[in-house]
Regions:
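Flavin (primarily FAD) cofactor-binding/catalytic cores of flavoenzymes
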Residues: 1-259
Length: 259
């Protein structure tokens, strides 16, 4: 029995954990795929360079056309089922999450975990997941070439698909989340786009959908700005990095600083 169970220590019965996000979905489990990654067939480096060479106007739409062709080549059945030909860089994220948003997130996580474990046993790669994974890395090189309008469109649409697919977590982490939920400890709170976060000395308040939630401990995992070298809390390392004078210092194969 691979089922993970969670039991509270005596005196910890009051423990409650809440995961919060705008859409209320859990990350999916890491999926089986070949490593090293196979090359893309349509969205090749040459094809991407040719799209860039046409200029920044409508670049995102040209790149998306390559993405559509790559997915149709790799996963024709999935592409037809999701209506890929009718989607745009702006609407693909809504189509990507549509099915998940109609299901309980923990039930979805349980089914996804079972699928991932079965595919791992059978060495089966889900073609559309694998194609999106490889496209993510390829398209990353194009993003700096987008104009301001396309950059905004990319972040609000297509980037959400890449991030969700890339941010899959180990199956064991999914098992632990499910165990915490079964134990009545873990829940998910869907905040939506319009919420307020108020920090107070002894608590954090979240206001959403005309509801008010209070938390004794709040961990902000939205992703903070990178620290500057001078902000590092390790004096000796900070001094050595500052002395080298570079934003990214030279390091050896064993990651020691080079003089």
């Amino acid at each position: 029995d691979k089922t993970t169970h969670f039991s509270l220590h005596p005196g910890s019965e009051a423990l409650e954990i809440t995961l919060m996000s705008r859409h209320g979905v859990l990350p999916e489990a890491d999926f089986y795929c070949p490593i090293p990654w196979e090359p893309l067939e349509i969205a090749t480096p040459a094809a991407l360079e040719a799209a860039i060479a046409e200029g920044s106007d409508a670049l995102l739409d040209r790149i998306f056309e390559l993405i559509v062709k790559e997915l149709e080549y790799a996963a024709p059945g999935w592409s037809e089922a999701i209506g890929l030909r009718q989607l745009t860089p702006d609407s693909i994220a809504d189509a990507w999450f549509a099915d998940r948003l109609t299901h309980d997130p923990f039930q979805w996580a349980q089914r996804n975990l079972q699928e991932v474990e079965r595919n791992k046993r059978e060495h089966h790669t889900v073609p559309w997941r694998y194609a999106i994974l490889r496209l993510h890395e390829a398209i990353e090189t194009v993003v700096p070439q987008f104009n301001d309008a396309d950059s905004r469109r990319f972040r609000q649409g297509l980037a959400r698909v890449f991030i969700d697919n890339y941010a899959a977590i180990p199956p064991e982490s999914i098992r632990r989340l499910l165990a915490l939920h079964r134990a009545g400890i873990l829940r998910i709170l869907t905040l939506g786009e319009d919420y307020e976060l108020q920090r107070e000395p002894d608590r954090t308040l979240i206001v959403h959908h005309r509801q008010r939630c209070e938390f004794d401990v709040f961990i902000d995992a939205r992703g903070q700005k990178a620290l500057k070298t001078r902000d590092l809390p390790f004096p000796s390392l900070r001094q050595q990095l500052l002395a080298c004078g570079d934003d990214i210092p030279d390091v050896g194969d064993d990651y020691t600083l080079q003089a």
